[in-house]
Amino acid sequence: MRYTYEHMKSMLQGAYKKLKSYYFYDKTLLFIKKKIAEFESDDGCFQQTFDVLAKALISENSAYFEELINQLDYRVFPKRLVAASAPTSTIVGTIDHHKNIAKVNFFIDVPIELLILDCLWTLCIAKISNKKYGTQACSYAGKFKASVFYFDQDDLYEGIDWESNRCFEPYYENYSRWQKDAFSKLRQGLQVQNQLMLSLDLKSFYYSVRFEFDSLSALLSDDSRLSEISFISHVEEKLYLSYTKLISKYKKGINIKNNATIFPIGLLSPILLRELYLYAFDQKIKFALNPTHYGRYVDDMIIIIPAEVQANNVTQNYVCNLLKEKGLIRKEISIQNEDFTFVGFESIAIQREKINCFYFEQNASNVLIEVAEKQIRDNSSEANLLPEFDVIKNHFNDIAYFFNSVGGSTKIRDIGILQSNNYAASRSITLMKQLLKNTYIAEQDRGKIEKFINDLLEFYSGSSAIEFMGSWTSVFELILQLKVLSDDKRKRDPLAQRFYRDIVYYIDYKLTFDLLDPKEIYSKKKATVFRRLKRDLKDRLGTSIAMAMALDYRWKATVSAQKKNIELAKKFRKSNIFNHNLVSFPLLNYLPFDKIATRSLLEIQKEPWSDSGVFSLDTQRPFWTPRFIHLDELFIYYFMQSTQNEKKNFNGKSDIEAIWKRYAQLNSVQRFTTESVAKQNSMELLGVNINLVNVSILNDVPSKYYVGLPNTTVSEDDALQSLVDPAHKMTIHDKEQLFRMANAAVKEGANFITFPEFFIPIVWLKDLTRFAQKNNVSIIGGLRYIRNANRAF
């Protein structure tokens, strides 16, 4: 390859930063998070890997990559669980915790070197594809952040940001926009005539696709830059072909022809290749239907078209016939098969029973739109508010379950099936953890929280634990948080033991393939896949425990694997692959690892750094950060540093400018920032000279301002008592009072919220700064005294 060693190494390191950030936020691929943690555990091997990779690429060392591809393997996890018994007319008053596996998902498992190479190749192909495709408006998933590419540079090295960890836009924002845009276009269409909204999904898309690497040249218009990465493309093709061959031994329906491949779940490249592959597919649908709106999120489509028939004629058959008339689909030959394949994309299919139709009348009150839009708005606004104590006072069961009643009726005869709401359950866990953070849990509160967790463990018992395995880490974090903040001295935690043993028991004795869809796995391979699935589930369980323990090692969750869990937890902490939101003080986990290797990251930092030498950011840890380091975190960090390093005061101008430059450097955003954000002047007020610092604000400012004045006081005794007793007024109730006042002020439209002097503990400041940022408000308040040995600030 034509790149120098220095350029190639820089590109590989940049690619690694981006893949690390992507998997940091991913909740599915815990085995890759573990792979990253183990990769960074040995500093020498970690750095050497980039050297070896760079030299192998420059010399186009095929044997080296052949050896890596030979280590290819797969992971397998449950995709869908179903009830063992057939539905009856009897309404059962309990949740079915005895479901079993109907479908599975396969994930690619490769050495970290191939993950890095895959990310590097993905970035290069994305840069090349920008020239032809730009931003695809109708596709909402897998979008690259605009800052990843320099559009005035065609060169693959100069034209890609290899310094930062930025890569994809947050999935939840695009998913929400996918829904909001659909309803917005629907409203516009209803101003003209009745509208029909169709919801379609592509059947087993990642396994059904037949991608050929030879098609890349045509897809990218024979771009000359493809030749620069032809060797990497060749390695990628061999990897895809090897994985396709491997999975086809187990999963039915993968009939390989020529050099076609499926898309490996677990790599970053399919996110991009999927969009290139479906570009013509999207255009064909838009041309054939001329829809009011067309939006696709991965393999889910929302299509809005003018309604040409009456509501009672809109059925799944009508939709299928319409798509056939437009030349988009054709029925499979098999009489029993209800699948329809897309013309020109014969490997891609939709299922009749999964077609959803919604009819909207032009001049009618379309309540469905209003309810859906309200739900989207509420989810967004709720996420901006601080959690309140209702999350404890309300029983967990009130949140996590609902009846699928007939018409919302409260009559006994209309009560439907009791169902689980995992979204509400997982959200309540997150809110509880945020509320508990940096509080002293009194005995009476501990009992309430234990009741909450016991209800939670009942919710996740039996098959529900397997079905919602994405919540394992979060549950263990909450249990550990309760143990640490309530100063529980017991060696073993009964709540953690219960959760762990319940999961292991179901895996060992209850989980089966008896209900497996006959189209999933070859019968001769079922036993092999099932053994692998059980092994992978147990490995995921151990990884979930270790990720929680990265916050505090003292917790003994299991007996047999205790030493193994702690060793892995240390690796997660060293690589910073764990939940940063629960770290007690901003950027504590970015200090030199030898200084924090054994410290609890959950305990409240009473006198955090009386040893001033500890309080300095590590030189390498921020460089390999998996996330964006926020400006408010740096302000709080450096403010605390000024109190711990015997600095007399915090200089309003020079310190702010220094922090701003540090912020830009840490996040590689120098090209987006201004030279200076702070200007200093002074004025005299009542005979006192006051220094003023003007900080540039780029956000829109309102024409009128409203000030929220919380009705609370701080006594002199309260202010002084916090010096003697750090736990003074640091309970859940005190934190909830602060949060409730802030929420109430925002709901009333306040732009400024003022709290009294000596009111806000500095360890709660991050919650408030993030709240202010999300709600575009300013918070003014006095901090409680800060201790440093025998000094107070």
Language model feature labels by segment:
Residues 757-793:
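Catalytic-core segment of enzymes that process non-peptidic bonds
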Residues 183-298, 304-314, 349, 414-571, ...:
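Conserved polymerase palm-domain catalytic core
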Residues 20, 27-46, 677-752, 759:
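N-terminal, active-site-proximal structural segment of metallo-dependent hydrolase catalytic domains
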Residues 113, 117, 269-278, 445, ...:
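Phosphate/oxyanion-binding active-site loops and adjacent basic polyanion-contact surfaces
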Residues 521-691, 698:
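Charge-dense, extended regions
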Residues 309-461:
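C-terminal polymerase-core module
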Residues 1-232, 256-257, 313, 511-512, ...:
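Conserved two-metal-ion catalytic palm core of "right-hand" nucleic acid polymerases
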